[in-house]
């Protein structure tokens, strides 16, 4: 593809040479046979190269044809095997991707791109220990390779080694200060570990790069809420809900905060907004049922929400207590 623009100049030069030769020959001889021969030669030349171009375009049909052709023509080069492996990875053909990456590594066992890519495939197959092994090998070859630190962090997280994951995410960020997903993942992981200050710091750094990311604002709101900064949490939840009108959780969490501060009318509104977006959230039906029972003494509405909560999640914790409350309220309901 990179030769297309330079070929314009090459084509002009070749065409000029043909024109010069053609005109020179006509000047030297006025014979019609020569002119006919020149025309015929040019036509045959164009037909030949057109056929070659058509055949060559088949190679450029897609990534598979291109890199398969490249590896057959240059079997000693690593890049065609690696790129063909990535193409198989994209379509989910992981077994074939492994074969291609292993062939690349047979040429150069220290090829860190191939080691990292092979680790990714094993990670997608949930073979996390094998994945970690290849990420480590990649990092031995290139200790500052940020994607391998990120990938090994994800693998550590998935097998429960959360502190190791934190350290690896920090390394990924150290070598690439603009690694957005590393900031995002580290922020959520830090919150899991109750490191709320680090979580807030990383969410803020991520949001500087992705200010319109609804779930990042939601995560920052959660971290603020866990720190007891309820006003800041409410602010982030509002931003999150505004950025993604189909995201119900910010409204649910705003309602939870409003319940803490006894702002019952506002809590009801936000719970109902959440249900409008996602009507099958059993926990919100339960919360509204309890609100209308305990704070509004509205038995019909309380019953409606409680029954929906039980219908949507029959085996939820406390299901027996909900059933008992429904029976109790049914007996209290005016006839």
Describe each region flagged by the PLM.
Residues 79-90, 112-124, 147-158, 181-192, ...:
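Conserved alpha-helical positions within TPR/SEL1-like repeat arrays
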Residues 293-335:
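Terminal, low-structured helical/coil segments at or just beyond the last alpha-helical repeat
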């Amino acid at each position: 593809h990179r030769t297309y623009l330079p070929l314009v100049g090459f084509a002009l030069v070749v065409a000029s040479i043909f024109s010069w030769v053609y005109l020179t020959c006509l000047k030297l001889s006025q014979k019609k046979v020569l002119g006919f021969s020149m025309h015929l030669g040019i036509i045959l030349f164009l037909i030949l190269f057109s056929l070659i171009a058509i055949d060559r375009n088949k190679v450029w049909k897609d990534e598979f044809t291109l890199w398969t052709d490249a590896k057959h023509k240059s079997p000693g080069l690593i890049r065609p095997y690696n790129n063909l492996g990535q193409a198989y990875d994209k379509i989910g053909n992981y077994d074939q991707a492994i074969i291609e990456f292993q062939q690349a590594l047979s040429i150069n066992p220290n090829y860190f791109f191939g080691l990292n890519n092979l680790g990714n495939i094993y990670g997608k197959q949930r073979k996390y220990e094998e994945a970690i092994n290849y990420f480590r090998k990649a990092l031995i070859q290139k200790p500052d390779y940020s994607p391998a630190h990120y990938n090994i962090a994800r693998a550590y997280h998935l097998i429960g080694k959360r502190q190791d994951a934190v350290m690896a995410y920090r390394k990924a960020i150290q070598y690439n200060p603009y690694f957005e997903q590393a900031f995002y993942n580290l922020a959520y992981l830090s919150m899991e570990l109750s490191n709320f200050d680090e979580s807030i710091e990383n969410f803020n750094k991520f949001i500087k790069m992705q200010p319109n990311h609804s779930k990042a604002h939601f995560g920052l709101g959660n971290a603020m809420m866990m720190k007891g900064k309820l006003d800041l949490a409410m602010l982030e939840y509002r931003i999150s809900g505004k950025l993604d009108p189909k995201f119900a959780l910010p409204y649910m969490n705003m309602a939870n905060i409003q319940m803490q501060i006894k702002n019952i009318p506002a809590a009801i509104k936000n719970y109902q907004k959440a249900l409008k977006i996602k009507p099958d959230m059993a926990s919100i039906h339960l919360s509204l049922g309890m609100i209308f029972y305990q704070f509004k003494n509205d038995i019909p509405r309380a019953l409606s929400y409680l029954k929906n909560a039980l219908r949507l999640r029959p085996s939820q914790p406390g299901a027996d207590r909900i059933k008992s409350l429904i029976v109790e309220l049914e007996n209290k309901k005016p006839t």
